[in-house]
């Protein structure tokens, strides 16, 4: 019988390797210090005693002592789980090999082949496509309509500007999961919206906002706009209020229209400042777990997918593979591929953005 648990063996093995690496580094630092002391003695200079070494550590290297505990925490709770997750992708740790009942084996890249070319490819690539479409749509809509709303609220002559801003900011103050659960009840087949539409005889039956794949995807994007637009509006408002008025006044004197001013002055300035935030929002939307999980739960169900629904993103599919299906190796592969996609896009987008190029030039 298998007494040992493979996952515990792997965790303790990785922890031992990390401990050995830390010990080797400390030992190397000790040898380096001993060599330095020997050089001092051979040159006839004074060798510091224990009290002097302690004062040097307490004064000149005090930051090293402060960083010891946080560094241990990072190693145990960030580095170790990350390496453990990567290692699982190269095993057959799934529902057929549950720990501690059975031991899993190292299988190389077979899990990657299963996801990219095997039975999981029919789920992975459609979900990857929808994830990218969702990330682009969610980022673009909140950015565009947030700027439009900021311009409207900063229009000259508009009364009660602070009141309007406060009303829109309320959606930020409300916890996101509360808003999503309320919208889920509001949009379901027997919710208030469908009830109102049928009472007014605008529809013969309930509109499947959350139960039809296409309707559900549009509903998710719309609800995300409700949550994300106020944040973009606040950021854009701060940028607009600090734009140099000389350029705008000069453009108005030259006869430029409001659209021309927006196109040539306002929008480029907003885009320059918000470019890093836009990239961050795009990556965040790729891994936006809350909106999908609380609004549709990944549904409606799709019989052609493995452990996934029509609106699942890669991150929510990863969650289902881990919690429901117990396919930890496949979930690890999805996590690695998602990270590779996000990291590649981030590097390319950041290095090619105007904000990065201006900072590098300075």
What are these regions (language model features)?
Residues 39-58:
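Membrane-interfacial, low-structure loops and terminal tails that flank and connect transmembrane helices
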Residues 1-20, 24-40, 62-362:
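A structural signal for multi-pass alpha-helical bundles of membrane permease subunits
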């Amino acid at each position: 019988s298998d007494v040992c648990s493979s996952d515990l063996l792997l965790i303790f093995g990785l922890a031992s390797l990390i401990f050995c690496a830390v010990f080797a580094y400390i030992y190397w630092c000790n040898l380096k210090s001993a060599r330095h002391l020997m050089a001092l003695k051979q040159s006839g200079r004074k060798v510091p005693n224990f009290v002097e070494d302690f004062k040097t550590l307490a004064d000149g290297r005090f930051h090293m002592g402060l960083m010891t505990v946080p560094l241990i925490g990072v190693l145990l709770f960030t580095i170790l789980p990350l390496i453990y997750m990567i290692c699982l992708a190269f095993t057959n740790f799934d529902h057929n090999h549950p720990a501690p009942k059975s031991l899993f084996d190292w299988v190389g890249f077979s899990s990657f082949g299963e996801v990219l070319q095997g039975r999981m490819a029919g789920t992975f690539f459609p979900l990857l496509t929808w994830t990218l479409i969702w990330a682009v749509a969610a980022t673009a809509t909140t950015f565009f309509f947030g700027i439009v709303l900021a311009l409207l609220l900063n229009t000259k002559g508009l009364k009660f500007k602070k009141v309007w801003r406060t009303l829109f900011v309320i959606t930020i103050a409300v916890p996101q999961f509360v808003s999503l659960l309320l919208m889920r009840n509001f949009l379901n087949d027997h919710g208030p919206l469908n009830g109102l539409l049928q009472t007014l005889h605008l529809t013969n039956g309930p509109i499947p906002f959350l139960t039809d794949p296409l309707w559900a995807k549009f509903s998710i994007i719309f609800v995300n706009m409700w949550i994300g637009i106020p944040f973009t509006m606040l950021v854009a408002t701060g940028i607009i209020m600090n734009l140099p008025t000389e350029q705008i006044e000069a453009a108005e004197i030259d006869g430029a229209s409001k659209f021309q001013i927006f196109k040539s002055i306002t929008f480029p300035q907003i885009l320059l400042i918000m470019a890093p935030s836009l990239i961050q929002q795009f990556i965040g939307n790729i891994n936006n777990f809350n909106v999908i999980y609380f609004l549709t739960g990944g549904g409606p169900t799709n019989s052609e997918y493995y452990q996934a629904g029509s609106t699942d993103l890669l991150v929510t599919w990863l969650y289902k593979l881990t919690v429901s299906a117990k396919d930890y190796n496949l979930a690890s592969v999805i996590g690695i591929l998602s990270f590779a996609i996000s990291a590649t896009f981030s590097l390319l987008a950041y290095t090619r953005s105007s904000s990065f190029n201006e900072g590098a030039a300075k």
